[in-house]
Amino acid sequence: MKNTVKLEQFVALKEKDLQKIQGGEMRKSNNNFFHFLRRI
């Protein structure tokens, strides 16, 4: 359970970063990150 909560908090932080930085390298790295999560 703890791992799931930490993951949700991490994703929430990533979403906040996306809202602050629209486009650019952040968006590319986030797309790669989500593709990585889908493979698991």
Curated annotation (Swiss-Prot):
GO terms for molecular function: pheromone activity. The keyword Secreted applies. The gene is comC. Acts as a pheromone, induces cells to develop competence for genetic transformation. It comes from Streptococcus mitis. Its main location: secreted. NCBIfam families: ComC_Streptocco. Keywords: Competence, Pheromone, Secreted. This is Competence-stimulating peptide.
